[in-house]
Amino acid sequence: MISPIFVIPADYTYYLFSHIYPKLGQEWTLTLSDELAQRKIHFNRFTPPSSDRQRYTLSAYLAARLAYRLAVWHEIAQWYGYRSVAGFSEGISAFSPEDLYSNLMGARLSLTLILNGDATNLEHYNQSMQRIIPSALDQLEAQPRQATQQWFDLIDGQWWNSQERVPDKFLVLKRDYHLADKRYPVLPFGETTPPHYLTLPDVYAGYSLKQLAEFQLWPTKQMANLPVPKTYWKEADFADLAEKARQIDQKTRPKTTKND
């Protein structure tokens, strides 16, 4: 697998597609590893399209949609205390401004490979992803190392604090609590390059994707600061959890020397 942040939801898109396509239309539940809550995806029973091509495409769209929701939950879980490595807080990364845009791009890249027939098996998928990433970065007008460092210097004190060190949460000062899968990148003040809009479909061939499967977050014994739900958290609850995080960060975020 490849290391950039957008490849994690890309890999999840491929993984979910490989499970969804053979079972499309069946009722079943996929259980994933815990992230504070126990992560489950419940797939509803429905009559899938009669066309092989439409079944394939619907499976791919549903996989990309769910992979992005997994990425959204990861941001929420990080803020509420999830740690993939014991003793190392991940709060610094929660809702950082580039995360969900990059995650959405990863889901889109994987979706493109699947729809183009460039992910027939895991090896084929990995090879195809290696090829598509450079062209995607070119389209996004990725900048060379020196220009990137100059921007880091310009936004020091606005987006991040060079006086802090990992894992201090407020090394990152700028966060984006907007969760939707219709996104522009968050741009620094003064950036004039037109942003690239990314989105995922909500409907395909008359099927509302959100009605085909439900992402469920069930309580565990290790919820850290995550409130315990009455039954389980679902996608409809994500915005409230993110808004609570935003309000607390707004109160506790240190004042900076620029644009405060």
Ranges and model annotations:
Residues M1-I92, L111-D260:
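Bulky hydrophobic segments
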Residues E90, S102-N103:
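Long, domain-scale functional regions
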Residues E75, D99, M105:
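Divalent metal-coordination and catalytic microenvironments
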Residues F95-S96:
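Hydrophobic/aromatic-rich structural module bridging two neighboring secondary-structure elements via a short loop
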